[in-house]
A protein has these predicted regions:
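Extracytoplasmic gate region of multi-pass secondary transporters
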Residues: 11-72, 160
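Hydrophobic core of transmembrane alpha-helices in multi-pass small-molecule transporters
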Residues: 27, 110-124
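Interfacial helix-cap and linker-helix signal at transmembrane-aqueous boundaries
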Residues: 44-45, 75-76, 163-172
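Loop-to-transmembrane helix entry/capping segments in MFS-fold secondary transporters
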Residues: 51-52, 139-148
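C-terminal ends and interior cores of transmembrane alpha-helices
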Residues: 91-104
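Intracellular juxtamembrane helix-capping segments at the cytosolic ends
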Residues: 124-137
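Symmetry-related core transmembrane helices of the 12-TM Major Facilitator Superfamily/SLC fold
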Residues: 176-193
């Protein structure tokens, strides 16, 4: 209650462990999904798929990402932010695993399964990063605080695809890059869980069950 009642500004937010857990969690989450998003077409063409299929997959990931945005936002209002975020990251990891099993163009079904599962997982990021931050640092200066938090997102977007490309150039394989993306997603979910927005503000669904 004391945390929730505090009037936060950038300086006071920067001095907290929760801020840096969210900063690191958001950076790792973005690093994970952008590493895959940027290289997915190259990955598929490297396995002899037509570039047009790669473009189709990009579109499907976007479509199912939109579905995921609605679903994860809805779910987080009922079970809690970090639980929904962890499930979303789990979907992302499952999608990466499915993609990693695609060895050649005979596995078209796996490519479409990847697009659905990864896309839905990818959709967790937009609604949950903002709502988690708002739960933790709600107040008159929230926009400024969230802007600084979002630097982590930008860093992940810049680092992930570049490192993935460098790893491919060094190993002539995406195995290590996909492992990195998987690990980053797990770290992201863990960091958000440790930031524990549930201990600052309970979501409506949890409050309703507690009083039901």
């Amino acid at each position: 209650e004391r945390w929730a009642a505090k009037s936060w500004n950038i300086r006071s937010a920067l001095s907290t462990r929760r801020f840096w857990l969210l900063f690191g969690g958001y950076m790792c989450g973005t690093l994970s999904h952008q590493s895959v998003m940027v290289h997915q077409v190259a990955y598929l063409t490297d396995r002899q798929f037509d570039p047009m299929l790669g473009a189709t997959v990009v579109g499907l990931v976007g479509i199912f990402g939109s579905v995921g945005k609605i679903f994860w936002g809805w779910l987080s209002d009922r079970i809690g932010r970090e639980g929904a975020y962890a499930l979303g990251m789990g979907s992302l990891v499952l999608g990466i695993f499915v993609l990693s099993t695609v060895a050649d163009s005979s596995q078209l079904w796996a490519v479409y399964l990847y697009a659905v599962v990864f896309g839905i997982g990818y959709g967790v990021f937009a609604p949950l990063t903002s709502s988690i931050a708002a739960d933790v640092f709600q107040g008159r200066r929230f926009g400024s605080i969230y802007g600084v938090l979002y630097v982590g997102n930008g860093a992940g977007s810049a680092i992930g695809p570049w490192v993935s490309g460098a790893l491919f150039d060094a190993t002539h394989s995406y195995v290590v890059a996909l492992a990195m993306a998987t690990g980053a997603a797990v770290v992201s979910a863990l960091a958000v869980w440790l930031a524990a927005p549930r201990k600052v503000r309970q979501v409506p669904g949890v409050v309703a069950r507690a009083h039901g």
